[in-house]
Amino acid sequence: TTACSDWDDHYDANGIVTGSATTTLWENMSANKNLSDFAALAKKAGYDQVLSNPQTYTVWAPLNGSFDYETLNNMDLATMKKQFMQNHVAHFNYPASGSVDKSVYMINEKMKKFVGNGTYTMGGLELVQPNIPNSNGTLHAINGKLDFGFNIYESINANDYPLDSVSAYFAKYDMKSLDVENSVKGPVVDGQITYLDSVLVEYNALANNMRAYINNEDSNYTMILPTNEAWIEKKQYVDALLDYLPSYQ
């Protein structure tokens, strides 16, 4: 359809750093012995297919030994994919050339600062080998793993704080929808579009109803939440004041 063609054109490879690049991001990554750990995790997450297609990407790939490969390899696949792999890949070309001061949205919708002039950093990490050209984008080798950075929405469910009661209550209103623009389209099967990588937008209907878009990282919020102990105490107090119908008890 026209819409699908437009979507493909939106991410068609263009403006490659050098016009002689003939191999894909995946081919270059998988052939680079200094990026073998990152390439192994990329393949595990299905990004060998994503980074082989003709849409344009920039990858900031951490060098071997600059991150904890074993921990990531043993992580739940969905978590590793979102917090690590999608955290190092962005749509479009972001070359390290001249003066750069950009806020880059990664595939997982985390924002990173890409800055420099002669020497460059991404998310505070040095680009040790910038501008490795590819037929479908640009590859930068970096010295370390980019920080994931939990937003408020994610922190509530991270189990790092005594907020289980609040988390369970909010979870009733958790929603997900497909981010068509950032998902990577695959072949059409039986007339239906398939995706090599489906990016899901997570949001909370309860918070959104209060116009508290706590999963939106282009805004800043402060949220004060009760601990489990405080939640249970106040809930019991309120429950004693209310006379519930039998069907709501």
PLM feature segments, named:
Residues 4-249:
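Mature, structured domains of secreted/extracytosolic soluble proteins
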